[in-house]
Amino acid sequence: MNEKKQSRLRRAKSTRLHIRALGVTRLCVNRTPRHIYAQVISADGGKVLAQASTLDASLRSGTTGNIEAATKVGALIAERAKAAGVTKVAFDRSGFKYHGRIKALADAAREGGLEF
């Protein structure tokens, strides 16, 4: 594994331990060069309460690896989380920089009604 990925995974592990200590529901985000994924995971870490990604049929028709797609995923995850009764979450960016697609997803989720 290269050094850049090891550093990202180390940051992600540290963040997840901190969120687990808080005992709150988390919005976990993962990205690949082509897609972006978001999950709302229960406080005990055992259940996915809502999920959205660029693989969803409603979002798949457009481009999937850009900021516009991440914004749509953010709005969709906020809508689905609110439908599941979740309004307050901790943002787990999986060690990725808070920039670009990650930031766009987070901003759209906030506008959709999720509190970080």
From Swiss-Prot:
A GO cellular component annotation in the UniProt record: cytosolic large ribosomal subunit
UniProt keyword terms in alphabetical order: Ribonucleoprotein, Ribosomal protein, RNA-binding, rRNA-binding
Matching InterPro entries: Ribosomal_uL18_bac-type, Ribosomal_uL18_bac/euk
Biological process, per Gene Ontology: translation
MF (Gene Ontology): 5S rRNA binding; structural constituent of ribosome
Keyword match Ribonucleoprotein: yes
CDD domains xref list: Ribosomal_L18_L5e
Claim: rRNA-binding is one of the keywords in the record: yes
Family to which this protein belongs: Belongs to the universal ribosomal protein uL18 family.
Subunit structure: Part of the 50S ribosomal subunit; part of the 5S rRNA/L5/L18/L25 subcomplex. Contacts the 5S and 23S rRNAs.
Function (record text): This is one of the proteins that bind and probably mediate the attachment of the 5S RNA into the large ribosomal subunit, where it forms part of the central protuberance.
Stated name of the protein: Large ribosomal subunit protein uL18
Organism the protein comes from: Acinetobacter baumannii (strain SDF)
